[in-house]
């Protein structure tokens, strides 16, 4: 049931921060309505990458993805980037028309950089705008520090957990930071 007002939340885990040398190793999506109610969630996809790439991750990524079990899941995965891209496009298109939803998440520009390089059809399905919870976090730190400090982050660095945390964080900022006004019907 497509709705142009639905929001698509996404998170990726990567082998590092440079899309020229690093790769996507995990990705998931959640669709919410405009009130941040979860409507659907995709599978969590571990994307197969070579042992060489995984063995050359920096210390932080090696420790973090090793601790969560992601490195082993990536080694065992049969999913390619192209296959995962198509599965996510199929999932997303059930809920949102093309170019309607901003890409939603935390520091989402980083995910978008990797998507441009490795999943360009998926990146193109999103609107060019981002709904980045990190922006609200930075504004709250400066304009209302108590609101920023009251956000509890677990930081599991698992794609689905991180999306759910981003949605919860957005709810927090909506309730405690953004000024409420009578809600008008979205155009």
UniProtKB/Swiss-Prot annotation:
Residues 7-170 form the Exonuclease domain. The keyword Cytoplasm applies. One of its GO terms (biological process) is DNA metabolic process. Keywords: Cytoplasm, Exonuclease, Hydrolase, Nuclease. It is found in: Cytoplasm. GO terms for molecular function: 3'-5'-RNA exonuclease activity; nucleic acid binding. Coiled coil: none annotated. The active site is at 128. The keyword Hydrolase applies. GO terms for cellular component: cytoplasm. It comes from the Bacteria. Its EC number is 3.1.15.-. InterPro entries: Exonuclease_RNaseT/DNA_pol3, Oligoribonuclease, RNaseH-like_sf, RNaseH_sf. NCBIfam families: PRK05359.1. 3'-to-5' exoribonuclease specific for small oligoribonucleotides. Belongs to the oligoribonuclease family. PANTHER family: OLIGORIBONUCLEASE, MITOCHONDRIAL. This is Oligoribonuclease. It comes from Neisseria meningitidis serogroup C / serotype 2a (strain ATCC 700532 / DSM 15464 / FAM18). The lineage of its organism: Bacteria, Pseudomonadati, Pseudomonadota, Betaproteobacteria, Neisseriales.
């Amino acid at each position: 049931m497509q709705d142009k007002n639905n929001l698509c939340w996404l998170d990726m885990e990567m082998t590092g921060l440079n899309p020229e040398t690093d790769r996507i190793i995990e990705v998931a999506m959640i669709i919410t309505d405009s009130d941040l109610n979860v409507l659907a969630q995709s599978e969590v996809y571990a994307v197969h990458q070579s042992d060489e790439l995984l063995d050359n991750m920096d210390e932080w990524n090696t420790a973090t993805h090793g601790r969560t079990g992601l490195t082993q899941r990536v080694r065992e995965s049969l999913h390619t980037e192209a296959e995962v891209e198509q599965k996510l496009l199929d999932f997303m298109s059930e809920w949102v028309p093309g170019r309607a939803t901003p890409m939603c998440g935390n520091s989402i520009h980083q995910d978008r950089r990797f998507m441009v390089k490795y999943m360009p059809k998926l990146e193109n399905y999103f609107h060019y705008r981002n709904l980045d919870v990190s922006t609200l976090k930075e504004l709250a730190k400066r304009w209302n520090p108590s609101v920023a400090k009251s956000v509890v982050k677990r930081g599991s660095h698992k794609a689905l957990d991180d999306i759910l945390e981003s949605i919860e964080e957005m709810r927090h900022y909506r309730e405690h930071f953004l000024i409420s006004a009578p809600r008008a019907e979205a155009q």
